Amino acid sequence: MEILITYAIIFLLAWGLGAYMSRVFSSERTWLDFLKPLEHGIYWLLRIDPTRGMTWRGYALAILWTNLPLALLGYLVFIWQANLPLNPDKISGMSWDLALHTAASFITNTNQQHYSGQSQMSYLSQLVGVTAMQFVTPAVGLAAMVAVLRGLMGGMGGAKGNLGNYYVDLTRAITRVLIPMSFVLALLLTWQGVPSTFSGAKTATLLEPQTVSAKVISSQTIPVGPVAAMVAIKQLGTNGGGWYGPNSAVPLENPKIGRAHV
């Protein structure tokens, strides 16, 4: 019965979300229209004309232009994280090859991890590097999907060859779909016990000290951080790569059965 209820909830959410996203990308009225000033501020800042349609070539080039600078930013943050803020645990910078692999992996939505985030990434790297790409790459996927559908339906507004404006689609995917849903999901995860803090790692005293190689170990270090914020978009955007090396196998990412349903 529990499985049937879970699938029923998923079906209802998928139907409602699909209808909502259709309105978002069709420029119809939604309950998040109050974000229009923010979106137009982004267009103005980036010198984007939101009314200009794009052909498939223009759309594809715009995707590359968006992804490459973000990958470079992530790479630089990874290798310089030791000298940047939000590093309470004093984690050293990544090697150039590991940083390159990580940036390439997350910007392509491959999300392969050759690192353990809790011990090899600062909070800044986790948020500005990894989490930012976990927002942008699924948003790019949504925008590309919308462009393909417009092409199959004869072009935006019936104008053949007009796939819409990539930057508008990308912005709406982030501001009206991913961020609102991630915000709610992060609150639910925090409620379920997933860490959500900018303080450094915690030290806990063991109830039963252990002896390893003639050395008595009486305490352990528990890495924390703004984990819930990353896990929310990781799951929502079908991203891999969690805050911790073993991902959701770690109790701190997956503390209760309710979190699994979320």
Label each PLM-derived region with a short phrase.
Residues I10-F34, E39, Q126-G141, A249-H261:
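Short secondary-structure boundary segments
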Residues S22-R29, A147-G154, G241-P246:
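Juxtamembrane interface at the ends
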Residues S26, R47, S105, M153, ...:
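Generic surface-pattern signal
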Residues G41, I63-T66, L100-Y115, V128-L149, ...:
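Long, contiguous hydrophobic alpha-helical segments, chiefly transmembrane helices and signal peptides
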Residues P85-V130, S196-H261:
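P-loop potassium selectivity filter motif centered on the GYG triad
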Residues M121-A201, V250-P251, P255-R259:
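A conserved hydrophobic secondary-structure block that centers on an alpha-helix together
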